[in-house]
């Protein structure tokens, strides 16, 4: 078969018409320096603040400093093999992490990748780590409780759903123990939990995960890990990743609780990054935006309205509010709450639980200092029973502290003072609680009732603990239905008061303690 020149030219023209080249514009740059996990890049003209930059070897960096001639970026992961002259490119994406129910019961790193050896995670999608917090109109007041299971906290420093309650204290005062117990207490409450471990030893984190599993709370919890061996960038971003995972539940009309353990280490990691990026240092060498670092994170914890949830789910969920409750932890040095980061976080949060090393060392655990611990919005969320019965607890402890200081110098005290001192000592003893033993509302109400109405006055101080244990065992075995109903409702009326009175009086008559 022979083709003439006309046919050949027509064929070529047809092929040219069919030929389609898809052009794709990419912003590329060159690494000009690498040091301590920070790279400087030349040539990225269109990069955004916080954008992911693709590096050789399927790694990413995040652009943090946008300067006139270069971009300062922090590498997410190992950087030892990066060198000057390597080519990098913009992705046009902000850092996102996987979210969804498939993360519950799993241990993940800052990027949401599983590190527990249980296989891949079945996530429901991805969410940006940096999200603008809900506005004032989208929020609702805090009026539902989060029961921590601790008598001292639920009675004097109550926490509500959507609240930010700071746990602050020196090292080794039980901050993590309090937060872990709060998570364990939620295993039957329907509240999903996220535990973010920042800058901690891997052995400590493994112990926490084991304890959660032992007490049946891990199935309801996501553990986000940025251990001490991780880069400063991953430690800085871990709380935002955990928050994005918690917002998934909040925005779908569910309740979630997130623990940041601890934000002091996150601030130190951010300081390290900022100094390496040559940003100007301020007080205690922290950068000027360290307040914003924590405020933009903690403002994302909120109780959102049913309208917000309905809008977010496109009408799939109606008439349901959602909440994300935050328990940030801050470590102080020698009880100095006036340092830079502690004062910042105190001013951002809705109250603080101050744990004191002197109380901890004297055997009062949880070592809550009731004088300077406060909950600014939680009292509206307290259950009726606890609210009614805990009114005199704080007063009794305040009077006891005042009189105890005075009694050190006075030799002979009148009967009224002696009675107040004795009552204060017994209440202090009653508020002691073992770790991993959260108490339901019904048990707390019964114990507080006994303290409030003078049923402890004739019990020796040394026997308060055994009295409490025996009373609870008696009530749970002989008045099971009443205790279960009270734990569910948390109500308080004359009928419940009479029933509590009957239980305590019958128990004391038996003298089984």
Swiss-Prot record:
Q: Which domain of life is it from?
A: Bacteria
Stored InterPro entries = ATP_synth_asu-like_sf, ATP_synth_asu_C, ATP_synth_asu_C_sf, ATP_synth_F1_a_nt-bd_dom, ATP_synth_F1_asu, ATPase_a/bsu_AS, ATPase_F1/V1/A1_a/bsu_N, ATPase_F1/V1/A1_a/bsu_N_sf
Of the GO CC terms on this record, one is: proton-transporting ATP synthase complex
What enzyme class is recorded for this protein? translocase
Q: Which UniProt keywords apply?
A: ATP synthesis, ATP-binding, Cell inner membrane, Cell membrane, CF(1), Hydrogen ion transport, Ion transport, Membrane, Nucleotide-binding, Translocase, Transport
Q: Name one Pfam family in it.
A: ATP-synt_ab_C
Might you give the EC number(s) for this enzyme?
Answer: 7.1.2.2
Catalytic activity line of the entry: ATP + H2O + 4 H(+)(in) = ADP + phosphate + 5 H(+)(out)
| Membrane topology reported for the UniProt record | Peripheral membrane protein
Site positions per UniProt: Required for activity: 373
Subcellular location(s): the record lists:
Cell inner membrane
Residue numbers binding ATP: 169-176
Gene Ontology molecular functions? ADP binding; ATP binding; proton-transporting ATP synthase activity, rotational mechanism
Function, as annotated, reads: Produces ATP from ADP in the presence of a proton gradient across the membrane. The alpha chain is a regulatory subunit.
Quaternary assembly: F-type ATPases have 2 components, CF(1) - the catalytic core - and CF(0) - the membrane proton channel. CF(1) has five subunits: alpha(3), beta(3), gamma(1), delta(1), epsilon(1). CF(0) has three main subunits: a(1), b(2) and c(9-12). The alpha and beta chains form an alternating ring which encloses part of the gamma chain. CF(1) is attached to CF(0) by a central stalk formed by the gamma and epsilon chains, while a peripheral stalk is formed by the delta and b chains.
Family designation: Belongs to the ATPase alpha/beta chains family.
Q: What is this protein called?
A: ATP synthase subunit alpha
Which organism was this protein described from? Actinobacillus pleuropneumoniae serotype 3 (strain JL03)
The uppermost taxa in this organism's lineage are:
Bacteria, Pseudomonadati, Pseudomonadota, Gammaproteobacteria, Pasteurellales
């Amino acid at each position: 078969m022979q083709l003439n020149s006309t046919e050949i030219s027509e064929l070529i023209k047809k092929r040219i018409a069919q030929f389609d080249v898809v052009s794709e514009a990419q912003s590329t740059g060159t690494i000009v320096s690498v040091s301590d996990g920070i790279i400087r890049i030349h040539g990225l003209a269109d990069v955004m603040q916080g954008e992911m930059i693709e590096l050789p070897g399927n790694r990413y960096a995040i652009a943090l400093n946008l300067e006139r001639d270069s971009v300062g970026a922090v590498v997410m992961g190992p950087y030892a093999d990066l060198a000057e002259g390597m080519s990098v490119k913009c992705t046009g994406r902000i850092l996102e992490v996987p979210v969804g129910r498939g993360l519950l019961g799993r241990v993940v790193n800052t990027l949401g990748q599983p590190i527990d050896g249980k296989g891949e995670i079945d996530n429901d999608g991805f969410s940006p780590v940096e999200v603008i917090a809900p506005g004032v109109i989208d929020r609702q007041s805090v009026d539902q409780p989060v029961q921590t299971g601790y008598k001292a906290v639920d009675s004097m420093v109550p926490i509500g759903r959507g609240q930010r309650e700071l746990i602050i204290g020196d090292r080794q005062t039980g901050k993590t123990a309090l937060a872990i117990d709060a998570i364990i207490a939620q295993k039957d409450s329907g509240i999903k939990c996220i535990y973010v471990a920042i800058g901690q030893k891997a052995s400590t984190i493994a112990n926490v995960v084991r304890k959660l599993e032992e007490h049946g709370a891990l199935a309801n919890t996501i553990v986000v890990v940025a251990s001490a061996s991780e880069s400063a960038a991953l430690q800085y971003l871990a709380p935002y990743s955990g928050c994005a995972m918690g917002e998934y539940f909040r925005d779908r009309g569910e309740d979630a609780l997130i623990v940041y353990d601890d934000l002091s280490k996150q601030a130190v990691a951010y300081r390290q990054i900022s100094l390496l990026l040559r940003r100007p240092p301020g007080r205690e060498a922290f950068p000027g935006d360290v307040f914003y670092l924590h405020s933009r994170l903690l403002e994302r914890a909120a109780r959102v309205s049913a309208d917000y949830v309905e809008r977010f789910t496109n009408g799939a969920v109606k008439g349901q509010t959602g909440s994300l409750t935050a328990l940030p932890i801050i470590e102080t040095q020698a009880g100095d709450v006036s340092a830079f980061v502690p004062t910042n976080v105190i001013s951002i949060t809705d109250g603080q639980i101050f744990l004191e090393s002197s109380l901890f060392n004297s055997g009062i655990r949880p070592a809550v200092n009731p004088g300077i611990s406060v909950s600014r919005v939680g009292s509206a969320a307290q259950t009726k029973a606890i609210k009614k019965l805990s009114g005199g607890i704080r007063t009794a402890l305040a009077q006891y502290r005042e009189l105890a200081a005075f009694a050190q110098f006075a030799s002979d005290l009148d009967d009224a003072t002696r009675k107040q001192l004795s009552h204060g000592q017994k209440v202090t003893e009653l508020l002691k609680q073992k770790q991993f033993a959260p108490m339901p509302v019904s048990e707390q109400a019964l114990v507080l009732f006994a303290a409030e109405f003078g049923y402890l006055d004739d019990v020796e101080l040394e026997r308060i603990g055994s009295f409490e244990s025996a009373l609870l065992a008696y009530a749970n075995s002989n008045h099971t239905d009443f205790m279960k109903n009270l734990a569910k409702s948390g109500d308080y009326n004359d009928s419940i008061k009479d029933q509590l009175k009957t239980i305590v009086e019958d128990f004391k008559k038996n003298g089984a303690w």
